[in-house]
Amino acid sequence: MRDYRKLTDEEIRVLENNSCWAEDWNRVMVAEDFRPYNFHRVVFYGDIRLGVFEKTVEVAKDFTKHSGINDATLRNVTVGDNCLIEKVGNFINNYTIGDDCYISNISTMETTEGASFGEGHLISVLNEMGDGNVVLFHDLNSQLAAFMVKYFKDKQLKDSLTRLINEEIRFTQPERGTIGNGVKIINSKEITNTVVKEDCEINGAARLSDCTILSSKDDSVYIGTGVICENSIISNGCSITNSVKMQDCFVGEACQITNGFTAEASVFFANSYMANGEACAAFCGPFSASHHKSSLLIGGEFSFYNAGSNTNFSNHAYKMGPMHYGTLERGTKTASGAYVLMPAKIGSFSVCFGKLMNHPDMRCLPFAYLLAYGETMYIVPGRNITTVGLYRDIKKWPKRDKRAASSRKSIINFDWLSPFTVGEIVEGKKILENLRLAGGNNVSSYNFQEYIINASSLKKGIKYYDIALRIYMGAVLKRAVKEGFLGKPTSDTGLGKWIDLSGLLLPVSEEERLIEDIKNGNVESIRDVLNRFYDINDHYREYQWAWTYQLMLDYYGLDELTDQAMQRIREDYVRARRAWIAEIRKDAQKEFAMGDVEQEVFDDFISKLDHEVDYED
């Protein structure tokens, strides 16, 4: 706690000569080395604490002003060292301001009674009419949010998690609004009940009310012109600009939301990009993207997702209200004009075309194209495995993680082939083989859940799924050899079904174990819950090996993994990988033949494919 002293009579005289006034000068306390010369037309009410004002502040590039306070009314305010506060149209009330801040041309900044700073709000994601399934707070990440959405119907679990989160909020919440060190707030109208962490810049915001902005020196936040943000939390590295309107939202690390995007009761995590469109009750996991004015994300759970223009979802059957929702698993895309009627579940890395009206559940056929032609629905299983788009996506996502090393709360596992997706592939391959067995080889098409699968598509689907299986098994075996955990797994953890918890790939058994520990009171804080997610991720390769080892035995009909078997797996891996690259090359050539792809772009892509042989060993 800093020591303050009262003003001397001489200091009061200097201040009054500079047109400053205080309701009670005895309640204006200053730092030991305080000098009163850089204060002009300042009015003080209540308890005031002032630091030293010795340095200059950069207000624009190559333009500095001396620190001080000019043309402002302050009530119950603490100001740190070397701040410049000027042109406050209304007042600053009940705030603590850090060091080296620049606050200029604002209207009002105040903390009112009962301020929550956006923390502890219960919002309803996916089910727009729900009772609430995500509690907003500063340490929320995509895993915890997905976990809450999935299990908040379990009252005991909900009560336990809510209690842990409320304890964390109670321990960390300030008594009044705070502005961190190095913050710049200019040309902004209203900032109410908002915590702003260090090195944040707010320029031209219209209203920030009941918010927490988690900026930091190495991963700062920018809030731009016309932004209205209420009851929300914004994480490190974010940019919220150009008249965004946001209410009851959480924005995770390094997200960009811009160009008039509107959002309500939604969460956005890690590197998501939202522009022009709208989100309501949407769960946008890592790398979710929507660029277009006519796109609406509503009642859906997404990750590694790209919304084409005029993408739309309907969560309303016009009967019991807007209560329906669905999941588009990781890597899914919706083409321009796509429409999905909820509830729906789309398998990982699939692409949706047209108006999908019959509530598909296609998690068992991943990497598919789902197409609607009028009333007729088609599915092309495995088609996306061999596309240029998939190849580019899986290469670009790791490079586009813009989060600073110090602010990576959400866990992102970039593996496109994992026990989660490969488990779906294994199931999908069996479904296609059984359809062929039941329908025979001499038919033109097959039916699956009201979707038509052309015979040629079924045959290719089996082929592509098998290619992916062999690539996956060979890649995991290669890593096991290099990292020294080859051999029979020492634990059964990892066997069985896997899930994707918004970026974290984990066995269902580990999720179930965490649920039981929370309900039984074996987890003492919400940070312990988060640490469990990190611990599961740290053991991913170990759990993956246990699952993949059993897959290899089952696929090749083995009792154990011998040297001869490993050689065969490796040879199959190389052949499958080359077949995969050859199919992607064909896809690229087909697009190039359309005539508007520049030769240089095509040649660069083909060169990357040519170098894929370098990764075989």
Model-derived segments and spans:
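Glycine-rich hexapeptide-repeat left-handed beta-helix
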Residues: D3, V14-D24, V30-F53, V57-I69, ...
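Intrinsically disordered, low-structural-confidence terminal and linker regions
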Residues: M1-D9
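Long, compositionally biased intrinsically disordered regions
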Residues: Y373-D617
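A charged, amphipathic alpha-helical module
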Residues: N166-I179, I185
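Phosphate-/polyanion-interacting regions in eukaryotic proteins
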Residues: G68-N70, L74-D159, I186, T194, ...
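Core alpha-helical transmembrane segments of integral membrane proteins
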Residues: I179, V183, N187-E190, V196-I202, ...
